[in-house]
Design a protein with these regions (language model features):
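A short glycine-rich, Lys/Arg-flanked "PGG" loop and its adjoining helix->strand segment in the class I
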Residues: 142-154
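Class I (Rossmann-like) S-adenosyl-L-methionine-dependent methyltransferase catalytic domain
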Residues: 2-55, 63-117, 140, 157-210
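Hydrophobic pocket-lining residues that define ligand/cofactor binding sites across diverse proteins
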Residues: 95, 136, 152
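A short acidic, Gly/Pro-enriched loop at the edge of an enzyme's catalytic core
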Residues: 117-127
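Conserved beta-strand/loop positions that form the S-adenosyl-L-methionine
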Residues: 60
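Conserved sugar-transfer catalytic core signal across GT-A, GT-B, and GT-C glycosyltransferases
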Residues: 67, 132, 144
Length: 210
């Protein structure tokens, strides 16, 4: 597996997003460490908890597991949903290699909208999304977020990163659903159909049912 390779070398940008990402994860090394923003979110909300193993964190779209690896390494209990079987296998292998597997609660492979129904309501202290939800259209993303919020305990938190139209390579395509595009250059090139948000979209997506 090449550690440094561009998506254009391995992706035709054809097929479903799930198929495209399975192909990427099976041929390319991926990020192994979380963003500073994710680290700050976890630290601010949960570092002072006496027993970190009691804190349950769910990731929507764990990829190869950089975020959940960090959470597990910091002593938290982790669960996740991911399209890619290869991504999940790489995550589990990394945790096994570092003797962190005991922090894994549940990992499910499949569609977020469907798999969220398999988790109990009010069972997580936080859920996180490191850009993965952007690979769902606006309508589906809203459904997923509403379901994910129901999985939070009282006073639970969530962390989500979503792109704007200002991202490099984002070009409007009227043939695609609302505020989605299929970049062929920029950091998101050849990763499938991606949704972007303006300020109004963000309010509609994240305000919840109430």
């Amino acid at each position: 597996m090449k550690k440094y390779i561009s998506n254009i070398e391995i992706s035709t940008n054809q097929g479903t997003n799930a198929q495209i990402w399975e192909n990427i994860f099976s041929q390319k090394e991926w990020g192994k460490y979380p963003s500073e923003n994710l680290i700050r979110f976890i630290a601010k909300n949960f570092y002072n908890v006496k027993d970190r193993s009691k804190i349950n964190i769910l990731e929507l779209g764990l990829g190869t597991g950089a975020n959940l690896w960090f959470c597990a390494k910091e002593g938290f209990s982790v669960s996740g949903i991911e399209w890619s079987k290869t991504g999940v296998e790489r995550f589990k292998q990394r945790l096994e290699n570092e003797n962190l597997s005991h922090h894994i609660q549940e990992i499910k492979i499949g569609d977020y909208e469907q798999k969220l129904d398999e988790f109990e309501d009010e069972s997580f202290d936080a859920w996180i999304d490191g850009y993965s939800l952007a690979y769902n259209d606006f309508k589906k993303t809203k459904i997923i977020i509403e379901k994910a919020i129901k999985k939070l305990k009282k006073n639970g938190k969530f962390f989500s990163i979503t792109p704007s139209f200002n991202n490099e390579g984002f070009i409007k395509d009227e043939k695609l659903p609302y505020h989605t595009c299929k970049p062929t250059h920029g950091s998101d090139a050849f990763t499938g159909i991606i949704r972007y948000c303006d300020e109004k979209d963000i309010k509609q997506l994240y305000q919840g049912e109430n």
